[in-house]
């Protein structure tokens, strides 16, 4: 039996043990929603992240056009040109910093691989935000300013870099590009400082075995056809 597995599932599982105090019930509910593969609309923070990523993409691909704000139909006295100014959206400064790094890269690259852990076959797959010159980039957006956050090592427990580096052998680096709309924080991982994804999957499956009902859901909902 072969089952699919993703960084989203693994990270939602891990979050149950790494969430803020008092959020344990919410974290478990989020994991169960992911495990059951139930579709839910993005929450406010997720939508903000999607909007920010779209802005980065538009800038990187040269498609972004600022809004022109006309100043009441007035014209320049010498040239006769309409008077006004370009209005840039909130978070543009941070998006531009990321766009300058990922410009020329491939967006939303599907990556996958088959692997075997403890005798069980898995199909590991996902989508990289950007791949460029042997580096996988993931765009992250923080709704809080960096001044109020402790950023160092924010993603060390994420399975994302471990999973995607395993899926894309020609890549040698994974970089999280994180912005609060103004500043840029970069967190980098390679294979030497990333936990093998096989170890993470092993721990996940060992935990599932302690919850037989959830293991049954996983084997049913995440089975690979054929």
PLM region descriptions:
Residues 1-128:
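Metal-dependent nuclease catalytic cores that hydrolyze phosphodiester bonds in DNA/RNA
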Residues 9, 166-226:
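Metal-dependent nuclease catalytic regions and adjoining charged, substrate-binding loops involved
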Residues 44, 152-159:
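Short alpha-helix boundary/capping segments
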Residues 60-64, 141, 166-169:
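Hydrophobic/aromatic-lined pockets within catalytic cores
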Residues 111, 140-141, 178:
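Short, structured patches in soluble enzyme cores that scaffold and shape functional sites
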Residues 121-125, 132-134, 169-172, 182-184:
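Coil-to-beta-strand transition motifs
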Residues 126-148, 164:
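Conserved catalytic cores of phosphodiester-cleaving nucleases, focusing on short active-site segments
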Residues 157-168:
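An active-site-proximal "capping" alpha-helix that borders the catalytic cofactor pocket
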């Amino acid at each position: 039996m072969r089952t699919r597995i993703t960084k989203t599932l693994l990270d939602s599982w891990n979050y149950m043990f790494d969430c803020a105090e008092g959020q344990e019930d919410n974290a478990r509910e989020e994991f169960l929603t992911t495990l059951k593969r139930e579709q839910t609309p993005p929450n406010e923070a997720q939508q903000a992240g999607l909007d920010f990523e779209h802005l980065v993409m538009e800038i990187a691909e040269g498609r972004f056009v600022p809004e022109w704000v006309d100043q009441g139909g007035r014209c320049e006295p010498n040239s006769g040109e309409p008077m006004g100014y370009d209005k840039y959206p909130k978070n543009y400064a941070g998006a531009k910093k990321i766009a300058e790094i990922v410009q020329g890269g491939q967006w939303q690259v599907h990556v996958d691989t088959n692997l075997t852990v403890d005798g069980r076959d898995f199909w590991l797959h996902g989508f990289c935000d950007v791949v460029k010159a042997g580096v996988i980039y993931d765009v992250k957006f923080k709704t809080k300013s960096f001044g109020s956050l402790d950023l160092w090592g924010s993603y060390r427990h994420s399975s994302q870099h471990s999973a995607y580096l395993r899926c894309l052998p020609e890549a040698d680096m994974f970089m999280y590009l994180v912005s609060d709309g103004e500043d840029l924080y970069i967190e980098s991982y390679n294979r030497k400082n990333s936990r093998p994804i096989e170890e993470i999957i092993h721990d996940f499956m060992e935990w599932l075995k302690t919850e037989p009902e959830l293991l049954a859901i996983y084997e049913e909902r995440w089975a690979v056809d054929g």
